[in-house]
Amino acid sequence: MMRLSSDSELNRAIRDIKRYIREDNSDPIFACEVLAKLRRKYWLFQGEWHNFVNELIAEHYGDNIIEFDGLSFVADKSLAMEYADIFVDEKRVETDRLLSLILGWNIADGCYQTEEVAIKEGDTVIDAGANMGLFSVMAARMGAAKIYAFEPVAASAEKLRRNLELNNITDKVIIEPLGVSECECTVKMFVEGGAAASFVIERGGRCESVRCVSVDEWVGRNGIDRVDFIKADVEGAERLMLKGAQETLKKFAPRLAICTYHLPDDPEVIEGLILKANPAYKIYHTPKKIFAKV
């Protein structure tokens, strides 16, 4: 595999891929198979890869609705990325062949649940970093009574709203157009393709100012009387979210599914913050996530 050392080499690699897809054969399935071969030759920066997947899905699906597992979602590149983290395990990839191929390149660490740490009937759930809402939809299907979906990026929140409507769960899921952090504040977020890219890692492109709140402040302000499950994929702000959720973890001991791949020391820092709040937690590490329960 060749690592690209300059913008010109990267652009040439992208042109090669697009030439195969758009000139040699318009079949998206063939395109995916060619892309798999080319990825062995070229190393693509994450942002460029996401942008390319976005183009491929847009060309194949347009503005259509994708249906799988009895659910419906707006076609979008985030669908592939989120589906891989939320619905797919080694036993089930039940989508059409194009999406399945894309998913196959993105499955790295399984779902936001394990046998030990899972959504239960009647749960109150915080979905921090809801994006377009696949986790919120799944949590509702599994019996959660109320889901609070935190999504500060306007374009993602609009897709989230549409997906809740498509699946008739607007009564169960409340959209909170906020980020989560250590305290109430306004921060700059790097945005790629209308979706959150990073709070803390400068990736170029445009920034959005997003309003953030701490989980503890939000729980107190809104009179939330139970929190049973917290899922957090907040683009590098997971440790800040946990610093602002210490009282919630101490009082309610929610089950936790927290991403740990944005910063090199995430696994140990995030574990430390969980145990600082509530030493009774049992911690389970996977390559990209921490799961915890009392």
Predicted segments with their positions:
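Phosphate/nucleotide-binding beta-alpha loop and adjacent structural elements of enzyme active sites
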Residues: M1-V294
